[in-house]
């Protein structure tokens, strides 16, 4: 429990390190999980189908699990639920390494999806220890730590996977257990006893959580922004590699460099630029600016005619990296201090749902245009779709801004 502002300030590095380790552990398995799933079948169509099943199982588990963990953290505190999440993720990683059946893999990956809700708890933790004015910057720092983890993790995972396919999962499990020990001995609690509330199973219902989020002090349009913007981002993750292969003939190396550039840029924006931007603009304005930047960026990615343009657009889309942290800070500020876990759990649940929906939209859309010759502008259809989603987000954000007018600093 925090008694002083000094203690609250000291807690931020603790949660940032915990999130960095957590994301590095998750990132380690990214290059090898599809290969592991493929090892259970020699048929390429079956490999694609079962990897889709694994991805959907994880996403649905995250959708269902995030509100549950959020509600539990409002009752018992952030620290014990974070520790539970670390333990569950560790078990799931070791389970993946040890299982010798496809259904066993699906079961333990589903467990991992439920426990991945601890990211929502980390966001609630930051909300607990931050004033409303600090939240956007600190959510940005947390996002930067996630980005660093996702940059480091896949590189290490790819190198270890080349040695042994199961080795990255043992490493991920070990990192997560290290996080469990770190959290147990070092991480302080952020939620005072007098700000906790009784647990009710209805609070763990994801549909109820999303409905409550939409009704939260006029932030309904922002919930739409979270959904549409998140869907656009997950569609990008779904199609990026194959899009660049179809349009520019890129292989694994070129795609690896480009994804690293995207990740490094996101870290710089959220970890370095977010603070100075917030000194000049309020989060409401940053959301608008970021969505304009993002809508333009997606359109230009789709319209790119040469590979180098993909890198140029990363720079054009710099402000797009400010949207998530800014929206989260506005939603968090609208929630009561007793409901931060439930609120952040609902946001995480919505993102989990979008992660399930995105492959169902992005992959078929890319497949529908994949027959066009290399370099054809029509191959950019998935990115044009993402741009349209961001325009929709922009309309909702403007609607919110008109209801809650805030001028730049």
Which sequence ranges carry the predicted segments?
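Juxtamembrane intracellular "pre-TM" segments in multi-pass secondary transporters
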Residues: 2-9, 188-225, 247
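Short amphipathic helix-loop junctions that connect adjacent transmembrane helices
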Residues: 31-48, 238-255
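Conserved MFS/SLC helix-loop-helix module at the cytosolic interface between two early adjacent transmembrane helices
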Residues: 63-102
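Helix-to-loop junctions at the C-terminal end of transmembrane segments
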Residues: 65-77, 269-283
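A membrane-interface helix-boundary motif in multi-pass transporters
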Residues: 161-174, 364-390
């Amino acid at each position: 429990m925090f008694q002083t502002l000094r203690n609250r300030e000291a807690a931020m590095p603790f949660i940032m390190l915990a999130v960095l380790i957590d994301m590095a552990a998750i990132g380690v398995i990214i290059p090898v999980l599809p290969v592991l799933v493929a090892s259970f079948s020699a048929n390429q169509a079956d490999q694609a189908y079962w990897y889709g099943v694994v991805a959907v199982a994880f996403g649905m588990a995250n959708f269902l699990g995030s509100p549950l963990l959020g509600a539990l953290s409002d009752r018992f505190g952030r620290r014990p639920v974070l520790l539970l999440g670390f333990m569950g993720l560790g078990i799931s990683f070791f389970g993946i390494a040890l299982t010798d059946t496809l259904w066993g893999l699906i079961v333990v990956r589903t467990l991992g999806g439920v426990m991945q809700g601890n990211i929502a708890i980390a966001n609630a933790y930051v909300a607990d220890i931050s004033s409303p004015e600090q939240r956007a910057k600190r959510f940005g720092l947390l996002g930067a730590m996630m980005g660093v983890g996702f940059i480091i993790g896949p590189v290490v995972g790819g190198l270890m996977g080349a040695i042994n396919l199961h080795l990255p999962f043992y490493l991920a499990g070990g990192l997560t257990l290290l996080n469990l020990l770190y959290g147990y001995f070092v991480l302080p609690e952020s939620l005072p006893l007098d700000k906790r509330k009784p647990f009710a199973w209805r609070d763990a219902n994801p549909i109820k959580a999303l409905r409550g989020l939409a009704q939260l002090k006029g932030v309904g349009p922002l919930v739409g922004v979270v959904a549409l913007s998140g869907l656009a981002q997950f569609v990008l993750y779904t199609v990026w590699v194959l899009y660049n292969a179809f349009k520019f003939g890129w292989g694994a190396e070129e795609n690896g460099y480009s994804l690293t550039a995207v990740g490094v840029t996101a870290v710089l924006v959220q970890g370095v630029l977010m603070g100075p931007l917030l000194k000049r603009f309020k989060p409401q304005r940053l959301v608008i600016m970021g969505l304009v930047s993002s809508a333009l960026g997606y359109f230009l990615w789709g319209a790119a005619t040469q590979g180098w343009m993909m890198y140029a657009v990363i720079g054009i889309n710099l402000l797009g990296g400010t949207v998530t942290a800014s929206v989260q800070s506005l939603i968090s500020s609208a929630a009561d201090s007793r409901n931060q876990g439930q609120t952040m759990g609902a946001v995480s649940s919505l993102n989990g749902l979008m992660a399930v929906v995105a492959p169902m939209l992005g992959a078929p859309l890319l497949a529908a245009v994949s027959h066009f010759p290399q370099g054809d502008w029509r191959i950019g259809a998935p990115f044009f779709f993402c741009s349209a989603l961001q325009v929709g987000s922009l309309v909702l954000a403007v609607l919110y801004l008109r209801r809650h007018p805030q001028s730049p600093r």
